[in-house]
Amino acid sequence: MLTNTKPDEKIFQKNSTTGSYWITTFGCQMNKADSERMAGTLEKMGYTRADNELNADLVLYNTCTIRDNAEQKVYSFLGRQAKRKHKTPSLKLVVAGCLAQQEGESLLRRVPELDLVMGPQHVNNLENLLGKVDLGNQVAATEENFISEDITSARRESSICGWVNIIYGCNERCSYCVVPSVRGKEQSRYPNAIKSEIQKLAGDNFKEITLLGQNIDAYGRDLPGTTKEGRKENTLTDLLYYIHDVKGIRRIRFATSHPRYFSKRLIQACYELDKVCEHFHIPFQSGNDEILKQMSRGYTIKKYKNIIENIRSLMPDASITADAIVAFPGETEKQYQDTLKLITEIGFDQVNTAAYSPRPNTPAAVWSNQLSEEVKKARLQEINDLVEKTARSRNKRYINNIESVLIEGLNPKNSSQIMGRTRTNRLTFVEIPKNIDFNFSLGDEIDVRINETRPFSLTGELYL
């Protein structure tokens, strides 16, 4: 077994065996972007994408550990593949991502059929690690690693909308969150490297980019440079101005934001820069200040409301989405009701909700005031019902509006419709006109009159 080998330790020239591969991705947008990069590496090595995981010569699970149910799903998938490997010993079985980082070598002991366990900081090192596997080693790569600016060419899932990582890791210490221990410290990419990647995407006819970071407002804190006024000059705001002139890119998004660092200057930039879309994903997690303090979030509900007010004062129709956790340890009924009240007051377009799940090596996991599964289930159901009701009400404002929709493809459930997204990130289905000659290409922007709404999508017709 080789464990925690140095990233630059070259013990092979070229992988001797390739074949087909399959990647299953669990979790967040960061994982999706990492999976695209690993797929690009595998195809550069000579692998081809399998039609399903049961036919693949290499199966890779890019995992999430933010909640227990995400972990259990991975172990279920691994169990099936472990049985398959007994029948097909040549199968390569890889676990990447946050669960791999959290469990490390213990995952190799739990699932001895695994060939490679690699944390998210080793995405760029996949080829070298597989070379070590080819030499007959079982490999764990979970040591802290500097993430190279030499971003591997990704195999993009979309040909129109591209993920662009701008900062890795997280320096926050929220009491419930395992991310800092599995994603590592913040590492910002340099602006010129980011812009070069975006220019390449534009050259490949991409029309939209989403800048990604676990805590994207922290971008640049670890980079050198200050202005004459003493302000950091490499911030997310500065980056938006810097990349805005890339020709061919029509839309710019970013996620995920932290309320502690969401500034008026950033809001002003989003208002001034035409390509930056009017969609803001800003998790609030709880509507109660005492719970926020116990979560170590570093802001109050008053501050959060001020952020939303500042956004809507400049962009009244902006879409506001968020994350929320219910049944945090010790959360009283009154504190929980404060969260429901905030959802109603703000009028979110969408909220990703979860019941609290204890995570290893986090302070809240060992607190004695854990709530019962019954309470968790009831509160999660109630908040989900409210989120859907609020989203349904919010979407009604689009009726009869003319919205610009970026075409992403055909509706997979209805071939008579094309689908895309508005600038506010509303999924929109558009009936293909039958009475006129209508030709479209992926990446076209079309005007759509909205005539029907659902909680999380819109339907409309081409507006000529």
Swiss-Prot record:
<dbReference type="Pfam" id="PF04055">
    <property type="entry name" value="Radical_SAM"/>
</dbReference>
<keyword id="KW-0411">Iron-sulfur</keyword>
<comment type="function">
    <text>Catalyzes the methylthiolation of N6-(dimethylallyl)adenosine (i(6)A), leading to the formation of 2-methylthio-N6-(dimethylallyl)adenosine (ms(2)i(6)A) at position 37 in tRNAs that read codons beginning with uridine.</text>
</comment>
<keyword id="KW-0408">Iron</keyword>
<dbReference type="InterPro" id="IPR038135">
    <property type="entry name" value="Methylthiotransferase_N_sf"/>
</dbReference>
<dbReference type="InterPro" id="IPR005839">
    <property type="entry name" value="Methylthiotransferase"/>
</dbReference>
<keyword id="KW-0819">tRNA processing</keyword>
<keyword id="KW-0004">4Fe-4S</keyword>
<dbReference type="GO" id="GO:0005737">
    <property type="term" value="C:cytoplasm"/>
</dbReference>
<dbReference type="GO" id="GO:0046872">
    <property type="term" value="F:metal ion binding"/>
</dbReference>
<feature type="binding site">
    <location>
        <position position="64"/>
    </location>
    <ligand>
        <name>[4Fe-4S] cluster 1</name>
    </ligand>
</feature>
<dbReference type="InterPro" id="IPR006463">
    <property type="entry name" value="MiaB_methiolase"/>
</dbReference>
<keyword id="KW-0479">Metal-binding</keyword>
<feature type="domain" description="TRAM">
    <location>
        <begin position="396"/>
        <end position="464"/>
    </location>
</feature>
<comment type="subunit">
    <text>Monomer.</text>
</comment>
<dbReference type="InterPro" id="IPR007197">
    <property type="entry name" value="rSAM"/>
</dbReference>
<dbReference type="InterPro" id="IPR013848">
    <property type="entry name" value="Methylthiotransferase_N"/>
</dbReference>
<dbReference type="Pfam" id="PF00919">
    <property type="entry name" value="UPF0004"/>
</dbReference>
<protein>
    <recommendedName>
        <fullName>tRNA-2-methylthio-N(6)-dimethylallyladenosine synthase</fullName>
        <ecNumber>2.8.4.3</ecNumber>
    </recommendedName>
</protein>
<keyword id="KW-0949">S-adenosyl-L-methionine</keyword>
<feature type="domain" description="MTTase N-terminal">
    <location>
        <begin position="19"/>
        <end position="135"/>
    </location>
</feature>
<dbReference type="GO" id="GO:0051539">
    <property type="term" value="F:4 iron, 4 sulfur cluster binding"/>
</dbReference>
<feature type="binding site">
    <location>
        <position position="170"/>
    </location>
    <ligand>
        <name>[4Fe-4S] cluster 2</name>
    </ligand>
</feature>
<dbReference type="Pfam" id="PF01938">
    <property type="entry name" value="TRAM"/>
</dbReference>
<dbReference type="InterPro" id="IPR006638">
    <property type="entry name" value="Elp3/MiaA/NifB-like_rSAM"/>
</dbReference>
<feature type="binding site">
    <location>
        <position position="98"/>
    </location>
    <ligand>
        <name>[4Fe-4S] cluster 1</name>
    </ligand>
</feature>
<feature type="binding site">
    <location>
        <position position="28"/>
    </location>
    <ligand>
        <name>[4Fe-4S] cluster 1</name>
    </ligand>
</feature>
<dbReference type="InterPro" id="IPR020612">
    <property type="entry name" value="Methylthiotransferase_CS"/>
</dbReference>
<feature type="domain" description="Radical SAM core">
    <location>
        <begin position="156"/>
        <end position="394"/>
    </location>
</feature>
<dbReference type="GO" id="GO:0035600">
    <property type="term" value="P:tRNA methylthiolation"/>
</dbReference>
<keyword id="KW-0808">Transferase</keyword>
<feature type="binding site">
    <location>
        <position position="174"/>
    </location>
    <ligand>
        <name>[4Fe-4S] cluster 2</name>
    </ligand>
</feature>
<comment type="similarity">
    <text>Belongs to the methylthiotransferase family. MiaB subfamily.</text>
</comment>
<dbReference type="InterPro" id="IPR023404">
    <property type="entry name" value="rSAM_horseshoe"/>
</dbReference>
<dbReference type="GO" id="GO:0035596">
    <property type="term" value="F:methylthiotransferase activity"/>
</dbReference>
<feature type="binding site">
    <location>
        <position position="177"/>
    </location>
    <ligand>
        <name>[4Fe-4S] cluster 2</name>
    </ligand>
</feature>
<keyword id="KW-0963">Cytoplasm</keyword>
<dbReference type="InterPro" id="IPR002792">
    <property type="entry name" value="TRAM_dom"/>
</dbReference>
